[in-house]
């Protein structure tokens, strides 16, 4: 806030990068133009900000639809594997709700029967409560074919539970998590560092950014990676089989919002 209030310095172009989850509704960003300053809000959609504020978002709908489709397809021949569990850090967070919707849509489209969603906390603290995630899995019990942990740092509790208590098939999040636990069959990859590098490179080069940008499956910045130990397994075949439909559903989803 102090940075935004400071007078501009001649010949200086400043950049502030902020997480939209914490700052998208920050009052100071709703004020007047920022002059030569730029603010980049990541994990944020829309362009209802003054000149100088830019947003980008890695869409979670398509890649989550893809993940849900794989889980639904892998459960189609067994009533013992027809339920899946989504553990989310908090309710009413747009990125998480988009992921939950995509995952459940894909799961049901491939014949899954029951997708349950549980929330770890009421606010953003849910992203940093791995011990609580560990305990919550213990309370929920077994019987779910695949856990989708939309938890940020709290996902560490899910992986630890699968190692120490009950081997629970799990989807890795953000990076390839196959080295953390053998319970990870595949991981949803979000190449946030690569996108940030692209934006910063363009800024240094003096290139103009799009005011707002959503990057989905077709962009390559979100993806699914099968755990290396399963690369020759039927799981890898199912992941590839579900890709094309997921890309199309992602495109339809983004188009429907405009």
How would you label these PLM feature ranges?
Residues 1-258:
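A residue-level marker of the well-folded mature domains of exported/periplasmic proteins
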